[in-house]
Amino acid sequence: PERLFDTRPGTPASGHKGKLGPGEAIDVEVLGHAGVPTTGVSAVVINLTGTEADAPGFLTAYPTGQSLPLASNVNLSDPGTTAPNLAIVPLGPDGAITVYSSHGTHALGDVTGYITDSTAPVSVEGLFVPIAPERVFDTRDAGGPVAPDGTIDQAIAGTGHIPAGAVGVVLNVTGVDAPSPGFLTAWPTGTAPPLASTLNFWSTPTDTRANAAMLPVGTDGKISFYVLAGGHVLADATGYYIGPEGL
């Protein structure tokens, strides 16, 4: 995952800074940013987050140049809320997306992948294979809770119906019994921790939150999970991606 934009002042991501006002929209350049190629891309996979909301509302992401759709990607239920959601957003003709806010809030987005267009060469690499949802790990069953500011490495490829040769997975990641507000980040084991978040805890102790994540697997088919406040982590797989040699 790599941060594409962040409206909070002082954050390293480029682009618009400052809260989005009620009914305000910003255009975010995608092609050539956050690991996305400059050509051959039709859509971006992005974890979109709203934070420090002034009032209940929602965020909607859509292709730049199109009309605002009757749809939402992230719903913010209370003032001060932080909430993420994974979205696949088509790009506009200029390679950008537009992010609209119904009420005042900061917004940020982390790229976790992209969808190629018809100009990409035909290949089995990157082919998605769906599976029936299955639990691949749960720290409540083994290992115990993650310590505050702690990281665990979990074998994902080769677990359950995910073959050892898979290069990426789609997970529903859940944090349970977080003792205080914070966030969880998942990334390929063996690579540097990214400036990104997978899900956020914001309300009360023992908060439970879940979010979808599309992730490459790292060393030995593992994915690392960092939890700022600590707590239990579990993940359910819903599919995987085929590598260059197929499976």
Kindly give the residue locations of the regions a language model identified:
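Short edge beta-strands and adjacent beta->alpha junctions
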Residues: 1-247
